[in-house]
Amino acid sequence: EKAVEHMGVPVVILGQKSEKYPCIYHDDEGAACAMMEELLKSGCRRPAYIGVDRRDKAAGENRYRGACHALEKSGLHMDEVPYRVAAFSAQGGYQAMTEMLADGKRPDGVLCATDMIAAGVLSCLSERGITVPGEMKVAGMGHGTIADLLCPRLTTVHYHYHTSGREAADLLLDLMEKRGDSRNRGC
């Protein structure tokens, strides 16, 4: 933040909500809640969540809160379901699912904070002969390029990255030309 302030140029934060700077962000909490609700509606009775470090406000804290909210609405609590924190990678997802399966509390559905984590989960399950979506449903978030390459195809939350990028550019131009408001905008 000090370096940004020292530069003295307009700044727009993209992808994270900021109280200090104008920003364009996605509703990560709402998206995670909706995806966990979909897993539950599809018949999952033993859901799990693989998140990321909660110091990351968007992918960590907000997605965790969304998953918790969906679980609470269905009468569950995060303390009652398998939960792991993983690195932002397929390897992180693989390791987290390996640990969940070793605990003996095998979920029938898992929401992953990112598509890369979900890719690792799918790899782990495939190696162990656990069918997706037959024996376990897997969902990710972000609709990254990897989501369309996986087999089976990944159920994922699609964020409108092009729209948010365009809005961030428009907001930055407005700030540079000193016109328009600098309020935060959700996408």
Model regions and ranges:
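Bacterial carbohydrate/catabolite-sensing allosteric modules
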Residues: 5-187
